[in-house]
Amino acid sequence: MLDTQQIKEIIPHRYPFLLVDRITEVEEGKRAAGYKNVTANEDFFNGHFPEYPVMPGVLIVEALAQVGAVAMLIKEENRGRLAFFAGIDNCRFKKQVKPGDKLELEVDITRARGTIGRGKGVAKVDGELVCEAELTFALGE
């Protein structure tokens, strides 16, 4: 298991854009799982929406991308590199994510060749699917 400090040693994201609290499982270059505890104090709830707070879907996808980045950047040969978001396909949102939810995040790397890779991301709350997407990333310096 990786805590927030250990995650920050692998990916460059910082508050308020670090969207993963813990990595619970990781297989270098193959898959990673983790979670974000969504609190009422998240900055994005100030405007999305003040009377009905819902986590923006793009931030759910970004959280998935960060988990996928951990799977790739934890590999010794990728340490110190960046994982850039290069595309999203077949993204679907099934349920809303609200304050108090524990957003469970899983990414399976389906393809990695050179500096380009793809992963299948799934986000759940209480075991129920809230988002799924195919993510494309590019590794850079």
From Swiss-Prot:
Active site annotation, chain numbering:
H48
Principal cellular location given in the protein's record: cytoplasm
**InterPro entries according to UniProt:** FabA_FabZ, FabZ, HotDog_dom_sf
Q: Which UniProt keywords apply?
A: Cytoplasm, Lipid A biosynthesis, Lipid biosynthesis, Lipid metabolism, Lyase
Q: What is this protein called?
A: 3-hydroxyacyl-[acyl-carrier-protein] dehydratase FabZ
Q: What is the lineage of its organism?
A: Bacteria, Bacillati, Bacillota, Bacilli, Bacillales
What would be one Pfam family of this protein?
Answer: FabA
* Gene Ontology, cellular component aspect: cytoplasm; membrane
HAMAP family associated with the record: FabZ (MF_00406)
- List the NCBIfam families: fabZ, PRK00006.1
| UniProt source species | Bacillus velezensis (strain DSM 23117 / BGSC 10A6 / LMG 26770 / FZB42)
Q: Please describe what this protein does.
A: Involved in unsaturated fatty acids biosynthesis. Catalyzes the dehydration of short chain beta-hydroxyacyl-ACPs and long chain saturated and unsaturated beta-hydroxyacyl-ACPs.
Compartments in which it is found: Cytoplasm
Query: What reaction gets catalysed by this protein?
Result: a (3R)-hydroxyacyl-[ACP] = a (2E)-enoyl-[ACP] + H2O
Q: Which Gene3D superfamilies match?
A: Hotdog Thioesterase
One of the GO BP terms on file: fatty acid biosynthetic process
GO function terms (MF aspect): (3R)-hydroxyacyl-[acyl-carrier-protein] dehydratase activity
- What family is this? Belongs to the thioester dehydratase family. FabZ subfamily.
Q: Could you tell me the EC number(s) of this protein?
A: 4.2.1.59
